[in-house]
Swiss-Prot record:
Residues 1-75 form a transit peptide. One of its GO terms (biological process) is mitochondrial respirasome assembly. Pathway: Energy metabolism; oxidative phosphorylation. This is Cytochrome c oxidase subunit 7A2-like, mitochondrial. It is found in: Mitochondrion inner membrane. It comes from the Eukaryota. It comes from Danio rerio (Zebrafish). The gene is cox7a2l. The chain crosses the membrane at residues 86-108.
Amino acid sequence: MYYKFSGFTQRLTGAASSTAYSPQGLRANVPSESPAMIFGTPTKLVSESSATVEYMGKNRVPDLQRIFQASDNIPVHLKRGVPDRLLYRSTMALTVGGVLYCLVALYLAAQPKKK
């Protein structure tokens, strides 16, 4: 009896001698020609379309460039006002809280157990 590893069941299964001696994945009768292309039709490029795309919305890049490139001595992470300040402060509060929590957890883990 000959055995071969089954990739489907992940176990050894019975096999014929010819399949047991041939390595898996390497077959002698592999076709030499490549398969047909799945996407053989040419795709239409965006530049070829005549109508404007409606789902993109307004281009906000020039407005954001104007805001972020202004030299008003405000840090870049606070340039957009109140939402940026709120996000910055909440991020810093969570970071400080997480560091304190880790330090307390390390302190409690370092204490010997009471018997």
